[in-house]
């Protein structure tokens, strides 16, 4: 992909800030639904998908709540609530449907380059956790969305599901796992690159090495963006609609826009590390994404998992994440990001959230100070035979947790102008996996007048659009069969 040359002043109907999975997804929607709209993208780095969307900067899990225990809460009476898990599963099905549509119609090619079938496993230790996992399994198994899920405490069965993790285990240790065959590993970096290749072919204007410095509302309702390129050349760009999809960099731009709903919003950055295996023999012994349970007092983003990944054309094995304390909102950001994001309008909210979350800050600082030996000790809870020399540390991406109303939010959130002319996506997990649902929310809230004429096309692209798949077993079966075939997941 090459930079677009442009004059000192320019215009587009739609402007996307940040060339990650969110902007790529919204761009694909609008290109299909409204091809007459001109589209411009501004990305401050030298290529698309280099920050949170990059394959080395996220876990690559197709988050559909098949194995992630933090999506199923155990209530005070001991029962397990699966509502959030069902919702996330439905949302991920929308992502699979859009990707299938884009492959089926030739918009993007070679699905095996960005998605693979991989079993998803939940793994716990101890009797109390085993009972929780069994209740979770029993609740989820009642839904056709989780059909085929299995549960076992038997060490021999567990050894078939995850042989690397069961080597040299104490035969008397209480263990339990749930297993489901049709999970996915998604290379969101490769998918992002494919999406932007498609957008450029459809005449979208991609501007790499261009930083948006300011956003202002004009009297005619348009937005004026001040943009600076790598050489320091300033440019003014006007647009009817602006989407800020710059990951951690979205918050400062949202604040500059001056929209009402963005004034009280703050952000708290969290960095991440993974251990990556460098021994091909060890990598070959594991073929699953195995999620554990966060330790008592640890935040939701700390759920440990041992992941088979497919990166740069080969199978990899990663363990983590290990969180860290940082002031940066982006991996290639500035230590001034957090301090300068605190404004008179969000000071009270950020301060209140900070006081409430002092244990989180303490946890992050402790995580940042871990030695390799301490990280290896955590890994050995999953892989008892893990050898120091087989594992290296890789720095992952940044996430910025949304602070709103004095509370820290752990999901993703769309903030928009009252008239729908500007929207920004903030937050983290489940992130890229539910990018399609997040961008559908943008379409619904920002293009309400045009939505009726898009209904037929949206239903063609997303057969479950407007329906709750939890109540549609036959439709779900049809969609799953099509998705598996088109995305080459059936074998």
UniProtKB/Swiss-Prot annotation:
One Pfam entry name: Mqo
Cofactor requirement: FAD
Pathway membership: Carbohydrate metabolism; tricarboxylic acid cycle; oxaloacetate from (S)-malate (quinone route): step 1/1
Keyword Flavoprotein attributed: yes
Keyword Nucleotide-binding: no
Gene Ontology BP term (one): tricarboxylic acid cycle
Enzyme Commission identifier(s): 1.1.5.4
A molecular function GO annotation: 2-hydroxyglutarate dehydrogenase activity
Catalytic function, reaction form: (S)-malate + a quinone = a quinol + oxaloacetate
UniProt keyword terms in alphabetical order: FAD, Flavoprotein, Oxidoreductase, Tricarboxylic acid cycle
Cysteines engaged in disulfide bonds, as pairs: none
HAMAP family linked: MQO
Family classification: Belongs to the MQO family.
Name of the protein described by the UniProt record: Probable malate:quinone oxidoreductase
